[in-house]
From Swiss-Prot:
One of its GO terms (molecular function) is peptidyl-prolyl cis-trans isomerase activity. Present with 4401 molecules/cell in log phase SD medium. Keywords: Cytoplasm, Isomerase, Nucleus, Phosphoprotein, Rotamase. Gene3D superfamilies: 2.20.70.10, 3.10.50.40. It is found in: Cytoplasm; Nucleus. It catalyses: [protein]-peptidylproline (omega=180) = [protein]-peptidylproline (omega=0). Residues 57-170 form the PpiC domain. GO terms for biological process: negative regulation of transcription by RNA polymerase II; negative regulation of ubiquitin-dependent protein catabolic process; positive regulation of rDNA heterochromatin formation; positive regulation of RNA polymerase II transcription preinitiation complex assembly; positive regulation of transcription by RNA polymerase II; termination of RNA polymerase II transcription. This is Peptidyl-prolyl cis-trans isomerase ESS1. SUPFAM superfamilies: FKBP-like (SSF54534), WW domain (SSF51045).
């Protein structure tokens, strides 16, 4: 009888999917034999595996807008060497930006607002963080990013860095 993981992923027991940071792609690992390989193991239900990878990505690509506040882990940015606004003020400012996105998405693109106001160095790239996998971002940010579908925008997400709004693009 297939294991729960096998029935979800389409992989034969005991195989799992992992992600190679150096090669930037998925690979397959057998924890019993410690064998890893790039190709799907024999006996894989490829349709089920592709559905699983689509529905449960190993990595995502997101844009974000970060507003730091005085209690952020590093209350400084390219915009200000000493950020003094409260967490509530940062949240209120982010709500205003989200409203601007909702009101007229054609003239206020996510990327344009990130360039205009984000406290993250990714502002230069329109808030683009590139592709990342689990364990690479702060847990609250990562959880929100992986729950989004491509094209969706998050509610406000709090992290040690400040308050964010996230858009999944890949």
């Amino acid at each position: 009888m297939p294991s729960d993981v096998a029935s979800r992923t389409g992989l034969p027991t005991p195989w799992t999917v992992r992600y190679s940071k150096s090669k930037k792609r998925e690979y397959f690992f057998n924890p019993e034999t410690k064998h890893s390989q790039w190709e799907e193991p024999e006996g894989t239900n490829k349709d089920q595996l592709h559905k699983h990878l689509r529905d449960h990505p190993v990595r995502v690509r997101c844009l974000h807008i970060l507003i730091k506040h005085k209690d952020s882990r590093r209350p400084a940015s390219h915009r200000s060497e000493n950020i003094t606004i409260s967490k509530q003020d940062a949240t209120d400012e982010l709500k205003t930006l989200i409203t601007r996105l909702d009101d007229d998405s054609k003239t206020n693109s996510f990327e344009a607002l990130a360039k205009e106001r984000s406290d993250c160095s990714s502002y230069k790239r329109g808030g683009d963080l590139g592709w990342f996998g689990r364990g690479e971002m702060q847990p609250s940010f990562e959880d929100a990013a992986f729950q989004l579908k491509v094209g969706e925008v998050s509610d406000i997400v709090e992290s040690g860095s400040g308050v964010h709004v996230i858009k999944r693009v890949g």
